[in-house]
């Protein structure tokens, strides 16, 4: 598998801006073999899939918001830093996490979280939600000059913007830090919350100590609509380090703002996990979802390769989370991954191109 992954990585690095890779019959994980946590996908108007990731090292430097693009979800071309200039209120910190880019009203909005400079002298200050804007999907994005919302610890992270096709409302999902996953309506400018709106709590943590409980911490919200249901994908419980224990889960609702029912509550399963550890892949999760040209759904997510779990040998805390891809299937109104975890060998490749929007 390493040999095939190396070939794919080489091909991805050689792609030019207008190149179209040959159609694939199979692929193998990983699809991007470098630290690329919390991947969030966007379908661009130029025929490319764009993906954005948490701050990470690349070619001897540190990228605040990582970005890459692909025509087929397998060959990825690195694009450098989508947020090359830090915001004025977070110019001296290094925590730029879990971006999501939303295309609306002729511009691209980058929702992300960052640690404010004030936190360097006041430990009670936690991460903030933020918004940056660009006229191109690859950036550069320019921060709006103020945080969207701040709070304690890391409860205000992992934003995902979503336009509800049923109501036309502009929504923002977010949450982590042992708190709930929430949603709140955005104002028409999409850079502030709608006047008078309040956050709605959708999912809550479960403090049980059972080994199969991944909801002691929940984060990484991603929403899609299918056959009259809104599916809220989320992850938990510990992404990183020597005690990493992480998986992707799902809940659903008839409304974008809930109430959501977890798969476990609906089916009686022991938990709501659709993607857990398998083989040499540890702590998979924080997924995004897209469709290929055949209309099949695909999960892009990060996982830790136990054969090379660290970005730096001396760093036992920050795991090397690389990007994987697997097909999402459906049964009885619920999504699942064929083997319950990351694929470990050649798999049928996505149909290159875009599927229908839902």
Question: Residue locations for each model-derived region?
Answer:
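Bacterial N-terminal signal peptides
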Residues: 2-13
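Carbohydrate-active catalytic/glycan-binding domains of CAZyme proteins
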Residues: 14-358
């Amino acid at each position: 598998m390493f040999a095939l992954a190396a070939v794919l990585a080489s091909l991805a690095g050689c792609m030019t801006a207008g190149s179209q890779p040959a159609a694939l019959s199979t692929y193998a994980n990983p699809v991007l073999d470098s630290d690329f946590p919390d991947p969030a996908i966007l379908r661009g108007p130029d025929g490319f899939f764009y993906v954005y990731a948490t701050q990470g090292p690349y070619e001897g430097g540190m990228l605040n918001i990582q970005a890459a693009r692909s025509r087929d979800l397998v060959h990825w071309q690195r694009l450098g830093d989508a947020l090359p200039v830090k915001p004025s209120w977070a110019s001296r910190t290094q925590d730029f996490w879990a971006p999501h880019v939303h295309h609306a009203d002729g511009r691209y909005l980058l929702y992300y979280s960052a640690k404010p400079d004030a936190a360097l002298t006041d430990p009670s200050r936690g991460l903030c939600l933020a918004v940056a804007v660009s006229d191109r999907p690859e950036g550069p994005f320019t921060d709006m000059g103020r945080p969207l919302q701040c709070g304690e610890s890391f409860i205000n992270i992992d934003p995902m913007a979503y336009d509800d096709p049923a109501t036309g409302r502009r929504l923002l999902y977010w949450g982590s830090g042992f708190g709930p996953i929430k949603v709140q309506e955005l104002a028409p400018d999409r850079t502030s919350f709608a006047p008078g709106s309040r956050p709605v709590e959708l999912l809550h943590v479960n403090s049980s100590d059972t080994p199969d409980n991944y909801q002691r911490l929940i984060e990484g919200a991603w929403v899609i609509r299918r056959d009259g249901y809104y599916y809220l994908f989320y992850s938990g419980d510990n992404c990183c380090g020597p005690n990493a224990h992480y998986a992707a889960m799902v809940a659903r609702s008839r409304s974008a703002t809930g109430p959501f029912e977890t798969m476990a509550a609906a089916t009686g399963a022991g938990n709501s996990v659709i993607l857990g550890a398998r083989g040499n892949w540890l702590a998979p999760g924080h997924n995004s979802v897209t469709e290929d040209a055949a209309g099949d759904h695909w999960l892009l997510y990060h996982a830790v390769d136990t054969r090379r779990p660290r970005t730096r040998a001396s760093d036992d805390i920050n795991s090397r989370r690389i990007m994987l891809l697997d097909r999402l299937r459906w049964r009885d109104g619920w999504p699942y991954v064929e083997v319950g975890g990351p694929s470990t060998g050649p798999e049928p490749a996505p149909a290159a191109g875009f599927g229908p929007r839902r």
